[in-house]
Amino acid sequence: MQGTLTSRNTAINNVPSSGVQQSGNNLSGGRFVPNNLPSALSQIPQGNSHGHSGMTSRGGTSVVGNPGYSSNTNGVGGSIPGILPTFAAIGNRSSVPGLGVSPILGNAGPRMTNSVGNIVGGGNIGRSISSGAGLSVPGLASRLNMNANSGSGNLNVQGPNRLMSGVLQQASPQVLSMLGNSYPAGGPLSQNHVQAIGNFNSMGLLNDVNSNDGSPFDINDFPQLSSRPSSAGGPQGQLGSLRKQGLSPIVQQNQEFSIQNEDFPALPGFKGGNADYAMDPHQKEQLHDNTLSMMQQQHFSMGRSAGFNLGGTYSSNRPQQQLQHAPSVSSGGVSFSNINNQDLLSLHGSDVFQSSHSSYQQQGGGPPGIGLRPLNSSGTVSGIGSYDQLIQQYQQHQGQSQFRLQQMSTLGQPFRDQSLKSMQSQVAPDPFGMLGLLSVIRMSDPDLTSLALGIDLTTLGLNLNSAENLYKTFGSPWSDEPAKGDPEFTVPQCYYAKQPPPLNQAYFSKFQLDTLFYIFYSMPKDEAQLYAANELYNRGWFYHREHRLWFMRVANMEPLVKTNAYERGSYICFDPNTWETIHKDNFVLHCEMLEKRPVLPQH
């Protein structure tokens, strides 16, 4: 009947069983669920647990006189008979001394230590129960399959189940709530669980019975933990003996997650501004607990890998009356309550269902993985449903949850419509927007109407059928009197002079040279310019296009050089800037740069 513990090389991707080897009447393929602490435990014989309370509440733990938990956080401080002392702790405060930890934890040592606190230093089972890591009561009771016919199961507790009466007699109904919610197979509580209820009342773990507790905390310091009633309507479990020194880090770390009603304004029951959603109190409590479960799944992912189930796995036909009067267990402002598993499945859906039943396909053969116990094992709790029944119930609960969410949306819709209408009535419409256009179309303001839409011409008193021009009598649309007509005026006789005679070349021949140059430079693009240029050509002048000057050969002097392209000699030039003639000697004159005689217009 004595179990043997063998070491295994485990990997992160393919993790075998948690290291518990059983012989004789042990469970076939008994394993922890994926959110258990995968500690390697050896078998504790019957002789090691009879007649002793097993574990004390404070200051070191002794089993059969030997200290099992010491205040040393870096090694094995003492030994528990039946637990092999060869498995030391793997890191700083990351595991319970005397318990071998599977390599799946890896780097989880500091993470568990920071979240849970100094569990090893105080050696207090109450801390490990409430914090959800280390050696917890769910790990001893539910995860280790303590029932009457367990034989040599994970913990050898034949007969009257002395470990239940000895080790777990200092528990409370609050712990039973955790045991029921975190049982791996999710079935109803066995007879030993029911018997343990009477034994759990001797200590009252969460009801502040420990009188010599030097805790620095008080329940008045945490009003959020004591003000909200439990989801099942039972009495509220106080912080109690959770006020241990070892819980100081986890309370300080998690008190910031205190959930208040105003954090979820869209939920029923919230009163803010003009909003008041109507819903019965039972639905409010259910929805609040579902929200807490979602927060736990998001912010406390350590619980799935450290051996503590935050919301409870799916159960097929667990009796509800066994859990309705167990108050919720709170730690640092976040409630690990016995949430209704129907609502939990409806909110978390495939995630919880997959983690609860993912190992049904793995039970046939191959290396056993971390998952659920098989349905045909001898240690399975009675009353568990088949896989098809679980599927059917899950779909039924999911449908109820969707119908409940639809009711919530229909309850909130009339309020949204009313609030939208009230907001639109309070805010003044934009005069330049679509709402402002309505006042223009309705023509409430006459000035604005005439500016935007114009004025009806028939209202101005105009004769639209008249053949004459209307502008003679129409003064203005804002004028009440018609216009007086065109004003009377007379044109002077000088404006009626006769057309001057056309230009004649004979007239230009009579002008002097200065007059001709004046007409040419002062009347550009005029017929007089052409006539003046023609008269200058008649008098022996020629126009240079490049220099824009008039040239003439000196009389009685021939050019020094004369070719078809150019000629060089002495020339007389008229400078319009100085208005005089100048003499240029030895000047080269290109023939192509000379302007030809202009063509006079014919009248």
Curated annotation (Swiss-Prot):
InterPro entries: CCR4-NOT_su2/3/5_C_sf, Not2/3/5, NOT2/3/5_C
One GO term describing the cellular component: nucleus
Disruption phenotype: Impaired stable genetic transformation by Agrobacterium T-DNA.
Sequence segments annotated as region (Disordered): 1-70, 212-242, 306-335, 355-377
GO process terms (BP): DNA integration; regulation of DNA-templated transcription
Induction section of the entry: Upon infection with a T-DNA transfer-competent Agrobacterium strain.
Superkingdom of origin organism: Eukaryota
Swiss-Prot/TrEMBL keywords: Crown gall tumor, Nucleus, Transcription, Transcription regulation
Subunit note: Binds to VIP1. Interacts with Agrobacterium tumefaciens VirE2. Forms a complex made of Agrobacterium VirE2, VIP1, VIP2 and single-stranded DNA (ssDNA).
Protein known as: Probable NOT transcription complex subunit VIP2
Taxonomic lineage from the root: Eukaryota, Viridiplantae, Streptophyta, Embryophyta, Tracheophyta
